[in-house]
Amino acid sequence: MRFWGKFFGFVIGFMFGRFFGALLGLWLGHLYDKRPGGGASFSQILGQAKNRQGIFFNTTFAVMGHVAKASGRVTETDIRIATLLMDQMRLTGDARKEAQQAFREGKEPDFDLCSSLQAFRAVTQGRQELVQMFIEIQIQTALSDGELDAAEHAILMTVAQELGYGRQQLDELLKRWQAEFRFHQTSSGNKTSITDAYHLLGITAEATDQEVKRAYRKLMNEHHPDKLVAKGLPPEMMEIANRKAQDIQAAYDRVKSERGMR
């Protein structure tokens, strides 16, 4: 039984990235250990992971640019959302320039949305959490001005379909993100806040306590930062995943408080 890949992957990952790095190293080491005799080397596996992260990074900002231009022109709000995302990711220097360039490319009339999404889907096969987070980022861009026009919805529908999502799934994500946005805007004592807390968790006030817990665990599992990075999320985007997990936790705490749940 091979285990040296997992061992060295864990140790090296922990040295450079503590808990998150150890998880990523353990996963890469696992891939190395289970390869057949003539399979890919550790450096090739690492290269594949980096390539996946690079495609996720560039496609995210390129499609954001395309979504932002959907209404005919890129507004100050669109630019602010892209800048805020870069700030959340703490992008500086070459990484920030790369993101800005990808955003500009997405705004171009000849940007091939479907080809970009097909390449993205090819490297995220079996990593549904990554795909969902990607779609959620595009939804955030489309709703940056608080409204969703027909052109923006059409592009989001194309994004969803190319990545294996149906209209109902997209509408559910739209509903959850809108609830999350409002949840940030309202005070903890506001009735709208508890309604949006339920919507953010993807349930209604009629849900049982058990259903509330199940919905919370499912969402936290889907948005766990370390799991997302291990599946190919660029480390720079970990802060976005952290914030999403915090929002889910806040909504769950709000619902628990309202119900008197332990």
From Swiss-Prot:
Chief location: membrane
Subcellular location: Cell inner membrane
Record-annotated membrane-spanning stretches: 7-30
Cytoplasmic domain ranges by topology: 31-262
Gene3D superfamilies assigned: DnaJ domain, TerB-like
Gene Ontology CC entries for this record: plasma membrane
Topological domains, Periplasmic: 1-6
GO molecular function, one term: protein-folding chaperone binding
Membrane topology listed for this record: Single-pass type III membrane protein
Keywords recorded for this protein, A-Z: Cell inner membrane, Cell membrane, Chaperone, Membrane, Transmembrane, Transmembrane helix
Residues covered by the J domain: 196-262
SUPFAM superfamilies recorded: Chaperone J-domain
SMART domains registered for this protein in UniProt: DnaJ (SM00271)
Pfam families attached to this UniProt entry: DnaJ, TerB
Highest rank taxon of the organism: Bacteria
NCBIfam families linked to this entry: PRK09430.1 (NF006948)
Notes on the domains: The transmembrane domain is a dimerization domain.
Classification via PANTHER family: CO-CHAPERONE PROTEIN DJLA
Name this polypeptide is given: Co-chaperone protein DjlA
Native source organism of the sequence: Shewanella oneidensis (strain ATCC 700550 / JCM 31522 / CIP 106686 / LMG 19005 / NCIMB 14063 / MR-1)
